């Protein structure tokens, strides 16, 4: 796909901050140009829907727009600890108590298993893409290549939402554990403004301060951040081992007598929210551009960190519910309060310290990941190209880091955790589902190579997989006791996947590392992610729809025209270069003949 334009200007400006760093495209150079662009919106929109990027464009062309290269300093060791640091802390120390008490009881461990399996399926999809397309854009870049510009933009907006909201949730929980460490209630450190709505009236200045410190750590250099992360993560793992061992010594099996007080529905409802605990792994995929050997290091780092994470989550969930009846679990600081309840008041300080360490690394890795997402999104001119600039000295995207963490701090200052967690899960599941779809498209459809017959068969089977998965989720949400619907929807999903496996030939094989059991694992990832979406409350979907509506307005007014102009400018540059090269060849041949 032609998707360049403005490259020379960006290189010339380095890290400047001028008008052209924000709206350099032709459509925004005058009001007349802009009005003309708006009139052409339908045709431009169709162009962006039908246009797909190329692996080579993402790897070479897009990277050049940052002016400077990111430094390749990371190994599998760094990626593994980045994955562990990104994930462990957010789920265990933020949401486990909340979900065990309100939705699933002791069966919260099953919720972690369900969300963990779904996350592992997504990890496989991300890993293949990250190895094949090792750039900072993560899922945004993958969707640009396989599903086109428009779907990539919708994903990009939700990626931004995912990271900003996720960081805000963890920053607010950081305050809760800090208060516990000092023998205070979280509200002692928050400012209550009754004039604001109930969900936005508990202002959190400590969360803002934490975001500011993380910002400084994230911009100084990725290798330095990695050292800080794995030292902090190792300390955190020691605390986790203490919690598991010490917790089991205070276990009471009577607390497991009512294992599923909220039924199977509660297990899946919690699983949808607890998916928040696994989102850190996609931040690791954005570091592919800074990895020394992506083909080896990314699979080890991503898959390895997810295995460690899932085991830790399940063991700690079991420990918590054995220590204390689920009705008495504290939703804000569950482990600290649980140790106090069994007479180990001193242990809560170890737990609080470990939680603070864990949430600090979650924030740090999230800050690194979200800045790299934003950088690649800006390289595509879907956001101002000023955000794509990479600092020559540090090799990090300072502009994107500061902007994203400022937004995180603002939301953390106002918004309660429950709203953040529900909204985040919708966005995350939506993106992971589309990455699985993109993986199937990558394997089964190659432009110019796949026959029309095979393409049409693939689209039919993919549509049936999506439709049957959606129908299963809707039936689950609407029918609490019935089972007849599943006898229709599940076989359709199964037979559609079988048909894709045996009736549609794969058009492309991965060069280095690939997802096993295609199409089964991507198809299962699609089904599970959509099913978990069906377990989320209606209000969260309303907020998600509002945010998507805002994204569409921005896209129609700005993003569409910026990317269209950039694509056309780059196409002209390529054509001019090709003509020049052809002219040079002709001249050389003439000289030889002479």
From Swiss-Prot:
Transmembrane regions listed in the UniProt entry: 79-99, 105-125, 150-170, 202-222, 228-248, 267-287, 298-318, 349-369, 394-414, 419-439, 458-478, 484-504, 512-532, 544-564
The keyword Transmembrane helix is annotated on this UniProt entry: yes
Protein function: High-affinity permease involved in the transport of the cationic amino acids (e.g. arginine, lysine, histidine, citrulline, valine, and glutamate). Transport mostly basic amino acids, and, to a lower extent neutral and acidic amino acids. May function as a proton symporter.
GO terms for biological process, alphabetical: amino acid transport
Activity response to pH changes: Optimal transport of histidine at pH 4.5-5.
Name of the molecule in the record: Cationic amino acid transporter 1
Compartment(s) where it occurs, according to its Swiss-Prot or TrEMBL record: Membrane
Activity control summary: Inhibited by the protonophore 2,4-dinitrophenol.
Residue positions with a glycan: 102, 255
Similarity annotation: Belongs to the amino acid-polyamine-organocation (APC) superfamily. Cationic amino acid transporter (CAT) (TC 2.A.3.3) family.
Domain of life: Eukaryota
Expression tissues: Expressed in roots, stems, flowers, petioles, seeds, siliques, and leaves. Mostly present in major veins.
